[in-house]
């Protein structure tokens, strides 16, 4: 990385043509393998292992790939030649993984270097706790209790391939790399192996995680850059024609003349987006837009966003993907929690000159974060820890492991879910979840030793697997003051605790996300309108490009 920084600092002109030659360097593919291995395990070599490749022969394959890339010219390539010769790796999934992984590494260099150089100049130390998923919940607890409405937005996808390339072109000026990206995407689209209606994009995301997230983050950063600008300058937006605002070409040039246009031509229109208290949170494939304004203001934002995606990204965004809820009357889904603002009466005693009176008209708002038991049971059932009714079941696939390994796996799962849902206002769901995992572990061990669960507990005693229930108390006793634990474990389970070391969502929580959406009833209405809509963001990202290109 130090070598890259020196290269960039020498001459800024070479930044435009610096990326493409890196694609022919062997160490780029080694970096791609390391990053993919750390991101999702040994995903980079999954297809290679299926085809009979191993790590020893990977270096030979990389050299063979580079040699073929030297022989094939991506910049001048007719459609007839592409059908005759084909793109490098179109018959070899391992080659396609290497190309996409290497390309993802080199295109991230222009984004990472400025931040590193700027950080070195300013010497600003940033807390790593901000990466935690739980770091957003204290903000929601403090802010959302003062807000009135929230819009639950399902971020639209996919966009056309050419528009996606144009978005990346606004950030990367390396023309050969853009030609390679365009050729790579369109060739995969033509072979029906990269974008098809039969094969979901989730497979591509698993095999090429770094490249997949680069494409998605480029799209998200594009719309958020425009959206955040409009939010910051909302006091100047006086119901102007949005079609003049959201065109990508000369966008910032038009903004300079925006106040003049607004004052001269739009006196009769109402102010659209004047709201000093607006909060935006994005997570996975969804976003939340909360406001202290009125229902009319939220509806204006909804239709603006619908037209924004239609005009700026050239595809239809269904209005029912944005659902407006009043915080005091309905709940919204967020990172595996049901969140709702409850209005609680607060009695206040007033005393003056010996006389006292009780005033019970004071109302307080509090954001409650709840963990519904039905989606949790559904996720545990999908993982074969119980049935759909919540009755614990054994894990036959784990009976070949040792007793300590079986117990360690169950304890690890229980610890992960307990920590993730420790911010729940009511902990009854956690008690039941631990009960299911405890009995599932006992049934698995009993099945391994060919005995009954009752006989197993009688032999080991009632204290068997007690760590399922006592581990969190032991941990909190080391962190929290002794005074906070003086009243026992009941006091601990009534408090909401947010862990700032959780940087990824658990698979069981991910499984329960769809079930949680079905439980609310809001998503159920959307299913009745259009049953073929895709709920999970990672399954269908670039689907529209099949019909649009």
Swiss-Prot record:
GO CC annotation: chloroplast
Protein location: Plastid, Chloroplast
Keyword vocabulary terms for this entry: Chloroplast, mRNA processing, Plastid, RNA-binding, tRNA processing
A GO term, aspect molecular function: RNA binding
Alphabetical list of Pfam families matching this protein: Intron_maturas2, MatK_N
Residues spanning the signal sequence: none
The keyword Hydrolase is annotated on this UniProt entry: no
HAMAP family the record matches: MatK
Function summary: Usually encoded in the trnK tRNA gene intron. Probably assists in splicing its own and other chloroplast group II introns.
Protein name, entry field: Maturase K
Gene this chain is encoded by: matK
